Structures are given as C-alpha cells and as structure tokens.
A protein has these predicted regions:
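Conserved Rossmann-fold SDR core element
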Residues: 29, 96, 183, 193-210, ...
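Active-site loop of short-chain dehydrogenase/reductase
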Residues: 10, 68-69, 96-97, 134, ...
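Short-chain dehydrogenase/reductase
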Residues: 1-94, 105-118, 123-124, 300
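Rossmann-fold scaffold of SDR-type NAD(P)-dependent oxidoreductases
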Residues: 15, 97-110, 132, 156-157, ...
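Catalytic loop of short-chain dehydrogenase/reductase
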Residues: 106-110, 118-122, 148, 153-195, ...
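Amphipathic alpha-helical dimer-interface segment in Rossmann-like NAD(P)H-dependent oxidoreductases
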Residues: 92, 127-149, 163, 190-191, ...
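C-terminal helical subdomain
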Residues: 202, 222-305
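Conserved internal alpha-helix within the Rossmann fold of NAD(P)-dependent oxidoreductases
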Residues: 125, 135-140, 154, 164, ...
Length: 305
C-alpha cells in the first residue's frame, strides 16, 4: 500500500465497483493510499444479468496498481447473508471502516423511458427498485455499525441528479423513485450519523462516459468526441475519473462534515477542491442541461467545461 497518500491507513468499501463510477471511485481512493474492498456480481467466472465483461477482480487490480490495496469480494447486495458476511470480513481483517460508497445499480437494462407506469411490467419495475434502492438499504444496515465506531466516517450515496435537478419528473416512475431515494438516504442518514461524528452525502456525476455509454456511442475514451455527432449533449460528458476524484476529495477532507446530508455533483465539487477531469477541464453537465438543453440557450460546450 502507498503510505504517502492522504487516505493511507483508511479502509473503504465501494459497493457496486465492477465498472463505471464505482470502479473509478475505488481506483481514486486507491490512488490516495486506501485499502478498498470492491464488490459486485460480475466476476471472471460469472456475469450478472447486466451481461458486461468488466469484473470486480479487474477493479481490485486497478486499485492496487494505483497505489492502494484492492480486495475483491463477490457480493449480491440483495442477499442479506452475503452482505453480512462481507461486513464481518472487513471487521475481522481491518477492524474499521472509514468510507462506505453505495454505488449499487445495474438496472440500465430495465429502464423504459417514455412509458407510463402501468405500461411497464410490474416485476420489471420492482426489480429496478430492488437493485437501486433495497440494495443500498441492506448494505447500509450491515455496514454502518462498523462505520460509526470511529468519528470521521463517510457514507457516499451515488445517484443520478441532485435535489435541485430531480425536482422535475425523470420520465419513468421507477427510475425517478430509484434515483431520488439515495438523496433522501443521504439526508436521513446524515441526521442519524451526526451524533457519531460521521457524515452522509449524495454525489452525482454528470453525463458519465461509462464503458456502457462509450459502447452505446460506438467510441472509446480516446475518441469519445466522435460521439457528439450522434448526440450534441455528449460534448459535456465526463470520464468516470471525475466523480472518482470528487469522492476521494471528500474522503480526504477533514472538514467533510460541512456537507452532511447534502446532494453534491462532481462539477460542483471540482470547483471547491480544485481537481479536474482527465483532460484538465471541469465539466458542469447539470448547469449545461439546465441552461442549454432545457433552457434553450445557444452556447459553446467549452463554456461549461
């Protein structure tokens, strides 16, 4: 482990770290020297229903290569005994938990934008809620007793949108509920954790260039701008590293309690903590969506980077 990082000696659990934001968050915590337990359902031996090639073993290796200690633990966070065993293992091996990141989702294949609630299969909609809400609750139930043993613990709920942006309906009822619940969890758990000297926040990336999104646009991280021809709004997208750096900055902030209960965005936090995306810019996707996409303003995307 890198003993020089700002998070050296700290222990993190990133639940849902197989790919996308979760993977990048785990790696950035590792860059700062943390020991990071990474969980997910897709391993080198078995794929989840999402059917993507990325694995949690790869994520753990990336964490270690970045300077931390990555530990992969295959876990289905809807299976309570698996989550209980996970937290007991962290306790047994480390005796502490400093950062819990709930990035559990894996429901992209279930989203039906543009359909009325009653037009969506009930089991399909409820599965989305289980993957994106129940999993967060189960994980918090078992992990927070370990987190609160020491003052300074941090819970990060990863979602899509802030309390401001999610005031508007997100087109699909099940998706709307799934992505609003983590905002309420951060608020409620922030209140409950405060007496233990711990903090809870919700963090959202902007237009995330996840592996799945890059595949959707037929591009790679190296030539992602070619996707702008298909979707102009893709110009304001951000790499997963950006939100990873946001969470790492929060975890290393001795005054992180100032954010307790709040919903935050990667773009907002970049202006506070001074980090950038991999290309040196600071994408502010939510302001772009508000002013350009929804507001009808004509603008150069460079104004929002």
């Amino acid at each position: 482990m890198n003993g020089q990082g700002r998070l050296a000696g700290r222990v993190a659990l990133v639940a849902g770290a197989t790919r996308g934001a979760g993977r990048a968050i785990a790696v950035q915590l590792g860059t700062e020297g943390a020991t990071v337990y990474v969980t997910g359902r897709t391993t080198r031996a078995r794929r989840s229903e999402v059917d993507r090639p990325e694995t949690i073993e790869e994520t753990a290796e990336l964490v270690t290569a970045a300077g931390g200690t990555g530990i992969a633990v295959p876990t289905d966070h809807l299976e309570r005994e698996q989550v209980r065993a996970l937290t007991e293992r962290v306790d047994r091996e480390q005796g502490r938990l400093d950062v819990l990141v709930n990035d559990l989702w894996g429901g992209e294949h279930l989203v039906d934008f543009g359909k009325k609630m009653w037009e969506i299969g009930l089991e399909r909609g409820l599965r989305m809620l289980r993957l994106g809400v129940e999993s967060h609750i189960v994980t918090s139930h078992y992990a927070l007793p370990l987190l609160i043993r020491r003052p300074g613990g941090l819970l990060v709920e990863i979602t899509d949108g802030t309390t401001e942006t999610n005031k508007d309906y997100r087109e699909s009822l099940y998706y709307d509920l799934t992505k609003y619940a983590p905002l309420r969890m951060a608020l409620g758990l922030g209140t409950e954790l405060e007496e233990y000297g711990c903090t809870a926040v919700a963090v959202t990336p902007g237009f995330l260039r996840s592996e799945q999104m890059l595949d959707h646009f037929g591009v790679t991280e190296a030539n992602w701008r070619d996707g702008v021809a298909k979707e102009p709004g893709f110009a304001i997208s951000e790499s997963p590293v950006f939100v990873g750096r946001a969470v790492a900055a929060l975890a290393a902030d001795p005054d992180v309690a100032r954010w307790n209960g709040q919903s935050l965005s990667s773009g907002q936090l970049s202006r506070v903590y001074g980090f950038t995306d991999t290309d040196g810019t600071r994408p502010d996707a939510w302001r772009y969506i508000r002013e350009v996409t929804a507001g009808g303003r004509e603008a150069d995307d460079a104004e929002y980077r």
